[in-house]
UniProtKB/Swiss-Prot annotation:
It comes from the Eukaryota. C-terminal thiocarboxylation occurs in 2 steps, it is first acyl-adenylated (-COAMP) via the hesA/moeB/thiF part of the MOCS3 homolog, then thiocarboxylated (-COSH) via the rhodanese domain of the MOCS3 homolog. GO terms for biological process: negative regulation of JNK cascade; protein urmylation; tRNA thio-modification; tRNA wobble uridine modification. The gene is Urm1. Disulfide bonds: none annotated. The lineage of its organism: Eukaryota, Metazoa, Ecdysozoa, Arthropoda, Hexapoda. CDD domains: Ubl_Urm1 (cd01764). Interacts with cer. This is Ubiquitin-related modifier 1 homolog. GO terms for cellular component: cytosol.
Length: 104
């Protein structure tokens, strides 16, 4: 919770096709972020790494972004069309991470 009258920023995170295995096998999370700061996907990825990424971070994060093979959809739109890491999150955004990396 933030310390002033600025509301928290509520967003929904979803994980699919194996990505959920890296996040405690939880497919959907509703999270509240500090509404006093600007939240981009870049900030969100850092927050996720520090707070909810529980298994093998190298399979999800590469440098400051997601690994190749992780699709990111924001409100059902490919993040590449929305500015990728620079996209500024808005209240009730739905961010879906889909793993296309499968062994065989």
């Amino acid at each position: 919770m933030s310390n002033n009258n600025t509301p928290d920023l509520k967003i929904i995170l979803e994980f699919s096709a194996g990505a959920e295995l890296l996040f405690g096998n939880i497919k959907r999370r509703e999270i509240c972020l500090d509404g006093t700061q600007k939240w981009t996907i870049a900030n969100l990825l850092k927050w996720m790494h520090a707070n909810i990424l529980t298994e093998r971070p190298e399979l999800f994060i590469q440098g400051d972004t997601v690994r190749p093979g992780i699709l990111v959809l924001i409100n059902d739109t490919d993040w590449e069309l929305l500015g990728e890491l620079e996209y500024e999150l808005k209240a009730n955004d739905n961010v879906l991470f889909i793993s296309t990396l499968h062994g065989g």
